[in-house]
């Protein structure tokens, strides 16, 4: 069955990365993937979590939130603390960002990534990972210059959703596809093709190894295109 937006199974949605969207942050990126829009900022802060103190090493962590009207109906703000889904997503973003570093030898500083969804049409967590990597790259340059340490940023990290809809493996699901997918997965990749994380769920039963392999092939091809866009945004 054709996709609603006319894309082929292996096509990404239109992708745009606006580096430096927030001039106050040490690093920032406004990422648009189709109808999904996420603002990612990276802030360098003095100090580290308590368990990290005295080690001389830094840390990278992430927070994620959705604006109330990022979705078709208003969602209340999480004023009582992050819910389970939010915790899961921000931990994913943090793990992915740390995979971009060569290590944490940049003194007791924390780089905090804030990923705020302005508009959601599927793939918000994967868009956040890809945008956060651009913001992190710039923040690491700023930190290295101010702290007199080697730039800890080593490689780009990108993420994309894949799934099976109407029996067909597809790349970069929009919300309309995501909500009816037989299989829904998110894949995080460190450049060029190192798997950082694979999250996959059979929503209505099981799926075959061959289908998983096809989804991974789609994800690796998709993240290769995202890496190219990240490099272009960073001027590399």
Regions found by a protein language model. Give the residues of each.
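Glycine-rich, flexible beta-strand/loop modules in the N-terminal catalytic cores of phosphate-handling
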Residues: 21, 28-106, 195-217
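Short amphipathic beta-strand starts and helix->beta connectors
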Residues: 13, 96-100, 180-184
């Amino acid at each position: 069955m054709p996709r609603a937006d006319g894309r082929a199974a292996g096509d990404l949605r239109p992708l745009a990365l606006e580096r430096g969207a927030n001039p106050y942050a040490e690093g920032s990126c406004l990422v648009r993937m189709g109808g999904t829009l996420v603002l990612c900022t990276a802030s360098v802060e003095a100090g580290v979590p308590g368990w990290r103190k005295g080690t001389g090493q830094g840390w990278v962590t992430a927070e994620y939130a959705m604006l109330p009207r990022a979705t078709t109906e208003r969602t209340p703000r999480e004023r009582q603390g992050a819910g389970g889904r939010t915790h899961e997503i921000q931990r994913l973003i943090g793990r992915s960002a740390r995979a971009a570093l060569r290590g944490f030898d940049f003194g007791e500083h924390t780089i905090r990534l804030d990923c705020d969804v302005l508009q959601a049409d599927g793939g918000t967590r994967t868009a956040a990972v890809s945008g956060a990597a651009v913001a992190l790259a710039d923040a690491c340059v700023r930190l290295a210059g101010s702290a007199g340490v080697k730039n800890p940023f080593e490689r780009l990290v990108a993420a994309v959703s894949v799934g099976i809809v109407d029996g067909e493996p597809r790349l970069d699901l929009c919300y309309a596809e995501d909500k009816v997918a037989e299989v829904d997965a998110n894949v995080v990749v460190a450049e060029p093709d190192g798997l950082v994380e694979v999250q996959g769920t059979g929503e209505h039963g099981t799926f075959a190894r061959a289908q998983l392999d096809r989804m991974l092939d789609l994800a690796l091809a998709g993240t290769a295109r995202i890496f190219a866009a990240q490099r272009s945004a960073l001027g590399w």
